[in-house]
Amino acid sequence: MQSLPETNHLIIKLRSVADTLKEADLRARFFLQLLVRLNPMNLTAKILLALLLLQCKPGLTQEFTIPAISDLPRIDRQSPRPATAILRNSAFILKLKHHAPLGSGYVIITDHTDDPYMAALRELAEYRQAKIIHVADLGKIYQQDVLSAVRKQLIDLKPQYVAIAPRLESYRENMLLGMWELLSTLDDDKYLDAYPGVLLASDAKSFAALIQRSIKFESIAQKQLKPLAISQVPSNQESRSLQKAGILRNVFSSFGIQTPTIAIYTPAADDAPHLSGPQTWNIQMKNKGDFVKKFEPAAATALADASLVIMHGHGSPGMSCSVDIDGILTRSNNQIVLSGSCFAAAPLKTDFPKMTRIPGGYAVTPRQSFSTRYIDRGATVFFGHMRLSSGFPHLYPVLEKWMQGKSVGESYQQLINSLMDMRGLGPGKFVVQEVTPEQRGVPQNILLYVIIGDPALVPLQPLEKINKR
């Protein structure tokens, strides 16, 4: 009989090998369950069999399929739990929840005091006929005395739209969660009672330029819409982000719109699936940790021409889907950008425990966020997440609302309200007061999506499918 130390050593070895493979956590659990079921075999034989199966990566590669958008389940709190394969591939869509705003006004909440920032906000306020509420520090908006004072003003002003304009140093997780506490307590129900949007850039010049673009922005018409998809393929086994590019191509094709696609393959994805068709570029990275800082001319031209950029894949501060912030074009038509990667809208300072490793195996280092770099280089709207993003299931319903002609703020409000419902969060449960260093998961992480943009701005004119014309 196998001794306990030897057994433990083999189990540890199995887990070690499993951890070297992408998505190995799911397969390791499967094989550990398999060991228990193989009763006639001794433990050593079971371990060796599982190790052999784990190493046979080609045989374990997920089948690459591109389902129709209509075949993806729409999920809310009452929905049955989807199959494991659907969850693993993020092949589902969050159902969004409509909730009427408190009124029809427009309010700007800010802690800026410097003249260049305030001049830009006053110009936006004049354009939107808005009122400006000033607080000393938006990073502490969740404090009860501040909440009470601002809440009273909002109830009196009855806003439809609320633009949140924090200083860069007050842009943090509890600032955003504190805003959800504020906007969900303007009446008796638990939902956000206004359409929010975040106004943020890395400096006063970029901030003023963002406001100018927002004021001058005209919703993009179907004939002028030029989407582009960027997907990261991190391994031969993990192709779900590439799948989302295929889904998006089919969605836009139904509107008579072509979607150029850039797929970026890490060194571990040397035998992964590829999309075919015109205007498709496959970039194979040579070294682990390399990110794209310059695109080949043809891909760069297509990217520069795109008015809508949609990205799927892993990310870290300063990187999204294997594209480095230095790879963001200095001159482009990229007006609307959605990133489903983690940390795409990361704050410079965090209210949460520092993370050292994140999905994809990337290190978390302090860098300018992908979102503010894109805003600095001319984007008008950016969708991202402060920390760990769920990607497509939460990104696509926002994009879908924009394709229906909804505003930045309405889509943002519906996303947060639906996520509140999904996770059972509400007033009194938003702000994270204490988190232990060893705590792995923070439930409020799900509410840390950020949409930078004027909340009243409508990104797209409603799209009409070509078979309905």
Task: Report each predicted region and the residues it spans.
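Cysteine-dependent hydrolase recognition
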Residues: Q62-R469
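Short linear segments in intrinsically disordered or otherwise low-structure-confidence regions
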Residues: Q2, K13-R15, D19
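Hydrophobic h-region of N-terminal signal peptides that target proteins for export
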Residues: L49-P58
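Basic polycationic patches enriched in arginine
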Residues: R15, R27-R29, R37
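Sec-dependent signal peptide recognition
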Residues: N42-L49
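Short hydrophobic targeting helices and cationic amphipathic motifs
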Residues: H9-L10, L26, F31-L32, L43
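Intrinsic-disorder-associated, low-complexity terminal segments enriched in Asp/Asn/His/Tyr and depleted
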Residues: N8-H9, D19, D25, N39
